[in-house]
Amino acid sequence: MSNSVPATSTQPEPELAQLPPALTHESPEDDDYHRRFGGVARLYGAAGLARLEAASVCVVGIGGVGSWAAEALARNAVGRVTLIDLDHIAVSNTNRQIHALGDAYGRAKVQAMAERMVQINPRCRVTEVDDFVTPENLVELLDGHDYIIDAIDSVKVKIAMLGWARRVGRRIITCGGAGGQLDPTRIRVVDFSRTVQDPLLAKVRSTLRKDWGWPRNPKRKFGIDAVFSDEPLRYPEPEQQSCEIDEAPQAAPGASAGPQGLACAGFGSSVAVTAVFGMVAASSVLAALTAPDVSTAPE
């Protein structure tokens, strides 16, 4: 299911994937738009702001990492954002997910996040995809966006998304595991071939090299950025329960079971770390979207 929250824009809309028809939320005349985002214009320049307003970004996984990335996109005037997640907000999400409030428990994550985003930026067109990405539907859901933020922990789907994106030349940034870590200053962005201390990304990388023909030479880069932490993992004490499993609705036939957001997966987690993962991913995307076209850059 897909819902969209559009608002007036003078920018031509890019050709996006063929998503289902969407619900429209009309926004009132917004006279203070430039006051809202004047800080963005002063930072990135008028041309940079225009690029952000015209951009389309897809966030896959609206959990402890992806919800914060989506928040950053909205607060930086990105014009079109697609949110993809079939999960619903659970009490156990409260410690790390921005939309996890008392009156939101049980709601679809994409719906709660979309409503929040249009309150921040009434001109943002937010498309809600209440579904999981699978190897079978990823082209339909992801194709046509200017950038994709991978904030999921499904190894199979991560492999399929990254393999497809690299093969067809789609820009994507992938996020590693955010659980079991205390120090947000250890979070880094490097080429995906260079990550360390991240079992999730290591497993994905190994399969991409083995089954997708990605470079095995450690000196060769993949050309895809990854957000990860080089902090050694902190394991829970034996008497501590692992993560609750009340976050996962029954998957649709053919879909991957369980939630796809970067869950703690048995580790403890802190918003002081998970939020920084999302913000770092978003900041990398914003930098790429606002970079001047090399062909038109002054000599």
Q: Would you name each region that the model predicts?
A:
Residues K210, A275-D293:
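Internal hydrophobic alpha-helix adjacent to the cofactor/substrate pocket in enzyme cavities
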Residues V59-G61, I84:
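Conserved N-terminal Rossmann-fold NAD(P)-binding element of oxidoreductases
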Residues H25, V78-N121:
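Glycine-rich phosphate-binding loop and adjoining beta1-alpha1-beta2 segment
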Residues M1-C58:
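N-terminal charged helix/coil linker that caps or initiates catalytic domains
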Residues A54, L141-G144:
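Alpha-helix C-terminal capping/helix-to-coil transition sites in glycosyltransferase folds
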Residues V129-L138:
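Conserved SAM/SAH-binding loop
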Residues S2-N3, D146-Y147, I152-A272, V276:
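E1/E1-like adenylate-forming module used to activate ubiquitin-like modifiers
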Residues V65-G66:
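Hydrophobic/small residue at the entry helix of a nucleotide-binding pocket
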